[in-house]
Amino acid sequence: MTNQKTNINNNIDVPEPSIIDKLIHEPSRLIIISHLYIMENADLIFFKRKTNLSWGNLSSHASKLENAGYIEIEKVFRGKKPVTVLKITEQGRKAFDKYKDIMMNVFQV
């Protein structure tokens, strides 16, 4: 069974919706992982500013990405202040590469 459908109007293969990684596709998590893909790591304060999410929602989205193995959440100290840092994993990088490829295919239709 293929993961693509043939579009009757122009015979272009359209990806099945089921192959889109819904964990990444959610807008808040997409913002988080796309920034980490470029930056590799950033603290929660950065993402709070970028997403305008509440601390609880931001933590929830980060935890979902961590549970999937896409990011690591680390507590570090900058000077004497504790900081929570998010870091993309190799698995997260591969998942985002796959997501980008699928979405590029969607937008080329």
Regions found by a protein language model. Give the residues of each.
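Glycine-centered, phosphate/nucleic-acid-interacting loop/turn motifs that mediate DNA/RNA or nucleotide
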Residues: 69
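N-terminal helix-turn-helix DNA-binding core of bacterial DNA-binding proteins
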Residues: 15-57, 76-79, 85
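Short beta-strand "wing" residues that participate in macromolecule-binding interfaces
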Residues: 73
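Amphipathic alpha-helical dimerization/coiled-coil segments
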Residues: 2-17, 34, 93-109
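Basic, amphipathic "hinge/linker" alpha-helix immediately C-terminal to the N-terminal HTH DNA-binding motif
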Residues: 78-97
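Short, hydrophobic-biased segments on the C-terminal half of alpha helices
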Residues: 62-63
